[in-house]
Protein backbone atom coordinates (compact mmCIF):
# COMPACT_ATOMS: atom_id res chain seq x y z
CA UNK A 1 0.00 0.00 0.00
CA UNK A 2 1.02 3.61 -0.58
CA UNK A 3 0.15 6.75 1.31
CA UNK A 4 0.13 10.22 -0.25
CA UNK A 5 3.84 10.74 0.39
CA UNK A 6 4.71 7.40 -1.22
CA UNK A 7 2.79 8.34 -4.36
CA UNK A 8 4.86 11.50 -4.79
CA UNK A 9 8.06 9.60 -4.00
CA UNK A 10 7.35 7.02 -6.74
CA UNK A 11 6.51 9.78 -9.23
CA UNK A 12 9.84 11.48 -8.48
CA UNK A 13 11.70 8.19 -8.98
CA UNK A 14 10.00 7.68 -12.35
CA UNK A 15 10.79 11.22 -13.51
CA UNK A 16 14.43 10.95 -12.40
CA UNK A 17 15.00 7.60 -14.12
CA UNK A 18 13.14 8.34 -17.36
CA UNK A 19 14.19 11.52 -19.13
CA UNK A 20 11.59 11.09 -21.86
CA UNK A 21 8.76 10.99 -19.34
CA UNK A 22 10.28 13.83 -17.36
CA UNK A 23 10.52 15.97 -20.51
CA UNK A 24 6.87 15.35 -21.37
CA UNK A 25 5.61 16.49 -18.00
CA UNK A 26 8.00 19.39 -17.52
CA UNK A 27 7.02 20.74 -20.95
CA UNK A 28 3.34 20.10 -20.31
CA UNK A 29 3.17 22.46 -17.33
CA UNK A 30 4.03 25.91 -18.65
CA UNK A 31 3.20 27.62 -15.37
CA UNK A 32 3.18 26.14 -11.87
CA UNK A 33 1.55 27.82 -8.89
CA UNK A 34 2.13 26.58 -5.34
CA UNK A 35 0.42 27.83 -2.18
CA UNK A 36 1.66 27.40 1.43
CA UNK A 37 5.15 26.66 0.13
CA UNK A 38 6.62 26.84 3.63
CA UNK A 39 4.80 23.57 4.39
CA UNK A 40 6.42 21.52 1.60
CA UNK A 41 8.82 18.69 2.41
CA UNK A 42 11.95 17.52 0.61
CA UNK A 43 10.26 15.16 -1.84
CA UNK A 44 7.51 17.65 -2.72
CA UNK A 45 10.15 20.26 -3.50
CA UNK A 46 12.05 17.75 -5.63
CA UNK A 47 8.86 16.93 -7.54
CA UNK A 48 8.22 20.63 -8.23
CA UNK A 49 11.81 21.08 -9.40
CA UNK A 50 11.36 18.30 -11.94
CA UNK A 51 8.03 19.65 -13.20
CA UNK A 52 9.39 23.20 -13.55
CA UNK A 53 12.70 22.14 -15.10
CA UNK A 54 11.98 23.09 -18.73
CA UNK A 55 9.92 26.27 -18.51
CA UNK A 56 11.20 27.48 -15.14
CA UNK A 57 7.95 29.37 -14.58
CA UNK A 58 7.03 28.64 -10.99
CA UNK A 59 5.30 30.92 -8.51
CA UNK A 60 5.34 29.91 -4.86
CA UNK A 61 3.36 31.72 -2.19
CA UNK A 62 4.09 31.23 1.48
CA UNK A 63 4.91 32.76 4.83
CA UNK A 64 8.09 31.74 6.62
CA UNK A 65 6.52 32.94 9.88
CA UNK A 66 3.77 30.32 9.51
CA UNK A 67 6.10 27.34 9.22
CA UNK A 68 4.60 25.04 11.88
CA UNK A 69 4.73 21.60 10.27
CA UNK A 70 8.38 20.59 10.68
CA UNK A 71 7.13 17.76 12.91
CA UNK A 72 5.64 16.11 9.83
CA UNK A 73 8.58 16.74 7.53
CA UNK A 74 8.07 20.28 6.26
CA UNK A 75 11.39 21.91 5.29
CA UNK A 76 11.51 25.68 5.75
CA UNK A 77 14.76 25.50 3.75
CA UNK A 78 12.66 25.02 0.60
CA UNK A 79 11.19 28.47 1.18
CA UNK A 80 14.35 30.23 2.34
CA UNK A 81 16.51 28.93 -0.53
CA UNK A 82 13.93 29.28 -3.31
CA UNK A 83 15.78 32.16 -4.98
CA UNK A 84 18.98 30.08 -5.01
CA UNK A 85 17.27 27.13 -6.70
CA UNK A 86 15.56 29.19 -9.41
CA UNK A 87 17.41 31.79 -11.44
CA UNK A 88 15.94 35.27 -11.94
CA UNK A 89 13.59 34.88 -8.99
CA UNK A 90 11.51 37.94 -8.18
CA UNK A 91 10.49 38.22 -4.53
CA UNK A 92 7.27 40.10 -3.80
CA UNK A 93 6.73 40.88 -0.13
CA UNK A 94 3.11 41.11 0.97
CA UNK A 95 3.50 43.28 4.05
CA UNK A 96 0.37 45.41 3.98
CA UNK A 97 -2.29 44.08 6.34
CA UNK A 98 -5.99 44.76 5.88
CA UNK A 99 -7.34 42.99 8.98
CA UNK A 100 -5.47 44.16 12.06
CA UNK A 101 -4.64 47.46 13.72
CA UNK A 102 -1.05 48.70 13.79
CA UNK A 103 -0.68 47.95 17.50
CA UNK A 104 -1.58 44.30 16.91
CA UNK A 105 0.83 44.11 13.96
CA UNK A 106 3.65 45.70 15.98
CA UNK A 107 3.27 43.21 18.83
CA UNK A 108 3.10 40.28 16.40
CA UNK A 109 6.19 41.52 14.54
CA UNK A 110 8.16 41.95 17.75
CA UNK A 111 7.37 38.40 18.88
CA UNK A 112 8.01 36.68 15.56
CA UNK A 113 11.29 38.58 15.03
CA UNK A 114 12.84 36.25 17.63
CA UNK A 115 12.36 33.28 15.30
CA UNK A 116 15.41 31.89 13.55
CA UNK A 117 15.44 30.88 9.88
CA UNK A 118 13.14 33.52 8.46
CA UNK A 119 13.24 35.98 5.59
CA UNK A 120 11.74 38.75 7.68
CA UNK A 121 9.14 41.38 6.91
CA UNK A 122 7.70 44.63 8.22
CA UNK A 123 3.92 44.48 8.63
CA UNK A 124 1.93 47.69 8.36
CA UNK A 125 -1.59 48.94 7.80
CA UNK A 126 -3.17 52.12 6.52
CA UNK A 127 -5.84 51.66 9.17
CA UNK A 128 -6.01 52.96 12.70
CA UNK A 129 -3.41 52.43 15.40
CA UNK A 130 -5.98 50.72 17.59
CA UNK A 131 -6.12 49.85 21.26
CA UNK A 132 -3.09 48.66 23.18
CA UNK A 133 -2.53 44.92 23.33
CA UNK A 134 -2.51 43.35 26.80
CA UNK A 135 -1.15 39.97 27.81
CA UNK A 136 -2.48 37.99 30.76
CA UNK A 137 -1.30 34.54 31.78
CA UNK A 138 -3.12 31.92 33.84
CA UNK A 139 -2.11 28.72 35.57
CA UNK A 140 -5.04 26.66 34.28
CA UNK A 141 -7.76 26.78 31.66
CA UNK A 142 -10.32 27.22 34.43
CA UNK A 143 -8.45 30.24 35.79
CA UNK A 144 -8.33 31.68 32.29
CA UNK A 145 -12.09 31.25 31.81
CA UNK A 146 -12.75 33.04 35.11
CA UNK A 147 -10.36 35.87 34.26
CA UNK A 148 -11.81 36.34 30.78
CA UNK A 149 -15.41 36.25 32.01
CA UNK A 150 -14.57 38.89 34.62
CA UNK A 151 -13.18 41.13 31.88
CA UNK A 152 -16.29 40.59 29.76
CA UNK A 153 -18.47 41.59 32.71
CA UNK A 154 -16.63 44.93 32.78
CA UNK A 155 -16.63 45.36 29.00
CA UNK A 156 -20.36 44.74 28.62
CA UNK A 157 -21.05 48.04 30.38
CA UNK A 158 -19.59 49.75 27.28
CA UNK A 159 -20.08 47.18 24.53
CA UNK A 160 -22.76 44.75 23.43
CA UNK A 161 -21.93 41.10 24.09
CA UNK A 162 -22.20 40.30 20.37
CA UNK A 163 -19.29 42.71 19.81
CA UNK A 164 -17.01 40.70 22.11
CA UNK A 165 -15.30 37.56 20.84
CA UNK A 166 -12.90 34.92 22.14
CA UNK A 167 -10.57 33.34 19.59
CA UNK A 168 -9.29 29.82 20.24
CA UNK A 169 -6.77 27.68 18.41
CA UNK A 170 -8.90 24.52 18.55
CA UNK A 171 -12.56 23.86 19.35
CA UNK A 172 -11.78 21.74 22.43
CA UNK A 173 -10.47 24.88 24.13
CA UNK A 174 -13.99 26.30 24.37
CA UNK A 175 -15.06 23.85 27.09
CA UNK A 176 -13.68 25.77 30.07
CA UNK A 177 -15.24 28.99 28.78
CA UNK A 178 -18.60 27.33 28.15
CA UNK A 179 -18.71 25.83 31.63
CA UNK A 180 -17.90 29.21 33.15
CA UNK A 181 -20.49 31.06 31.06
CA UNK A 182 -23.18 28.50 31.91
CA UNK A 183 -22.33 28.83 35.60
CA UNK A 184 -22.66 32.61 35.68
CA UNK A 185 -25.52 32.79 33.18
CA UNK A 186 -23.62 34.64 30.48
CA UNK A 187 -25.11 34.10 26.99
CA UNK A 188 -22.73 32.97 24.25
CA UNK A 189 -22.63 31.22 20.91
CA UNK A 190 -20.00 29.12 19.15
CA UNK A 191 -19.12 30.07 15.57
CA UNK A 192 -17.46 27.42 13.42
CA UNK A 193 -18.29 24.56 15.76
CA UNK A 194 -20.84 23.05 18.12
CA UNK A 195 -21.35 23.86 21.78
CA UNK A 196 -19.57 21.32 23.98
CA UNK A 197 -22.70 19.91 25.61
CA UNK A 198 -24.54 19.74 22.27
CA UNK A 199 -21.94 17.53 20.59
CA UNK A 200 -23.16 14.05 19.74
CA UNK A 201 -20.38 12.24 21.60
CA UNK A 202 -21.15 14.22 24.79
CA UNK A 203 -24.90 13.65 24.53
CA UNK A 204 -24.25 9.91 24.21
CA UNK A 205 -22.32 9.79 27.49
Per-segment meaning from a language model:
Residues 64-65, 192-196:
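Short, acidic/turn-prone active-site loops that include or flank metal/cofactor-
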Residues 4, 8, 44, 145, ...:
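Short runs of predominantly hydrophobic/aromatic residues within well-ordered alpha helices
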Residues 1-81, 96-100:
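Conserved helicase NTPase motor core
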Residues 10, 47, 78, 144-154, ...:
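Well-ordered alpha-helical segments embedded in enzymatic catalytic cores
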Residues 131, 182-186, 194-205:
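Conserved short internal alpha-helix adjacent to the catalytic or cofactor-binding core
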Residues 46-49, 73-77, 107-108, 179-183, ...:
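Short, glycine/charged-enriched secondary-structure capping and boundary segments
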Residues 87-90, 95-188:
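Helicase P-loop NTPase motor core
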